[in-house]
From Swiss-Prot:
The enzyme's E.C. designation: 6.3.1.19
Nucleotide-binding in keyword set: yes
Organism from which the protein derives: Mycobacterium tuberculosis (strain ATCC 25618 / H37Rv)
Lineage, top ranks: Bacteria, Bacillati, Actinomycetota, Actinomycetes, Mycobacteriales
InterPro entries xref list: Pup_ligase, Pup_ligase/deamidase
Name under which the protein is recorded: Pup--protein ligase
Pfam families assigned: Pup_ligase (PF03136)
GO biological process: modification-dependent protein catabolic process; proteasomal protein catabolic process; protein pupylation; response to nitrosative stress; symbiont defense to host-produced reactive oxygen species
Residues at the active site: 57
């Protein structure tokens, strides 16, 4: 499948402080954030005009699920649009607090762990064909996903009883199973719950919940681009060396704790391989696969960065990728700070920087400041993100949903939508079922809109 439907769901950490002290509980902050949403949507679970879903997840975490996208840059742009949508709610909520005489600064963090050790996720969705063994896909994909943090981790300072250590991934410490149907209780790497949001006879949806939330646009593109490419290779019958892991959960932590990528992890049958070895295998197959697939500039950009990052890890010289990979950008920031102020990694100021890197408020968040200074590379523009806040992707089913929502809101009509249904809540209860996520034009939807 060279054209694939993809989406990213991001849960955001939330807090409210006043002069540095916590002001409101996460529950209370979430209520202020969603008050405007509830006022027009009559719910804290809504679909937006750009086709995305916005809702309050378990544990007061606002969650944004992008609309269905069919290209990497489109997905990165719509993922960034989610940050802007949430930032808009943040500004509105702060104003409400001020109006009520409460005051306080609200922070939304696009990260995966809070100071209390709770974890929240960034889930990737990939449409895959129903034909073929799911077990083969997960067998080949698992070693790739366990070691992928080497190329696209968000980076984190982990405080241990002995000392502070810099890790590749925020999420790795919180994953407890390889493949499972649960998402919150056991936190697997691949979630097998079969909700395709499409024609179930043709497709299934691969739900990957091991990834970090990325601030860097280039890292997000690398994360989803490499996974989509590995899926494409599996579907094409590409043969990979067997890197089945003896214990994926132990391996994911071992990989996260080793920025050199060289520490051996145990494979099934007692063999060993490093994260670098495993990633090199998938990368080498990808380079070969590019010779046989249709040319695609975005995929070629992904494979180029993949190779440069593996070279950087091998040589431990990150100069050629230090504006493109989250964990590298963040580590460089910390190292500069430590050198300038003669500071240990365990210093509270570093922990503060670690958090501020993920602050999504423009002009305040550290990643945003780095990006403005040209210290973080981009694949999209502010103009394209602004458009994605209001407009759905024009090449997928999201366009139908977005146009239906816009028309119903403008006509003052009561409606219900989900990923596959568009329904007018009138006497006739007219409903259109959109089972094909690749289809951006549908006469039935046009007629439904015209009838308003």
């Amino acid at each position: 499948m060279q054209r694939r439907i993809m989406g990213i769901e991001t849960e955001f950490g939330v807090t409210c402080t006043f002069h540095g002290h916590r002001r409101l509980s996460p529950d209370e902050v979430a209520r202020y954030l969603f008050r405007r949403v509830v006022s027009w949507g009559r719910s804290s679970n809504v679909f937006l005009r750009n086709g995305a879903r916005l809702y309050l997840d378990v544990g007061s975490h606002p969650e944004y699920a992008t609309a269905e996208c069919d290209s990497l840059v489109q997905l990165v742009t719509h993922d960034r649009a989610g940050e802007w949508v949430l930032e808009d709610l943040l500004v509105d909520a702060e104003q409400r607090l001020a109006d009520e005489g409460i005051g306080g600064d609200i922070y939304l963090f696009k990260n995966n762990t809070d100071s209390a050790g709770n974890s929240y996720g960034c889930h990737e969705n990939y449409l895959i064909v129903r034909a073929g063994e799911f077990s083969r896909i997960s067998d080949v994909l698992l070693p790739f996903l366990v070691t992928r943090q080497l190329i696209c981790g968000a980076g984190k300072v982990l405080q241990t009883p002995k000392a502070a250590t810099y890790c590749l991934s925020q999420r790795a410490e919180h994953i407890w199973e390889g493949v499972s149907s649960a998402t919150t209780r056991s936190r697997p790497i691949i979630n097998t719950r079969d909700e395709p949001h499409a024609d179930a006879e043709k497709y299934r949806r691969l739900h990957v919940i091991v990834g970090d939330s990325n601030m860097s646009e280039t890292t997000t593109m690398l994360k989803v681009g490499t996974a989509a490419l590995v899926l494409e290779m599996i579907e094409s019958g590409v043969a990979f060396r067997d890197f089945s892991l003896d214990n994926p959960i132990r391996a994911i932590r071992e990989v996260s704790h080793d920025v050199t990528g060289r520490r051996p992890v145990r494979l099934a049958g007692g063999r060993q391989a490093s994260a670098l070895d495993i990633q090199r295998e998938y990368y080498t197959r990808a380079v070969e696969h590019l010779q046989t697939r249709e040319p695609n500039a975005q995929i070629e950009q992904v494979v180029d960065l993949w190779g440069r990052q593996l070279d950087a890890v091998e040589s431990q010289d990150f100069a050629k990728v230090d504006t493109e990979i989250d964990w590298v950008i963040k580590r460089k920031l910390f190292q500069r700070y430590q050198d300038r102020y003669d500071m240990e990694l365990s210093h509270p100021k570093i922990a503060q920087l670690d958090l501020a890197y993920h602050d999504i408020k423009r002009g305040r968040g550290i990643f945003d400041l780095l990006q403005r200074k040209g210290l973080a590379a981009r694949v999209t523009t502010d103009e394209e993100i602004a458009e994605a806040v209001d407009q759905p992707p024009q090449t997928t089913r999201a366009r139908l949903r977005g146009e239906f929502i816009s028309a119903a809101q403008e006509a003052g009509r009561d409606f219900t939508v989900d990923w596959v249904h568009l329904k007018l809540n009138d006497q006739a209860q007219r409903t259109v079922l959109c089972k094909d996520p690749f289809r951006a034009v549908d006469e039935r939807v046009k007629r439904l809109i015209a009838s308003m």
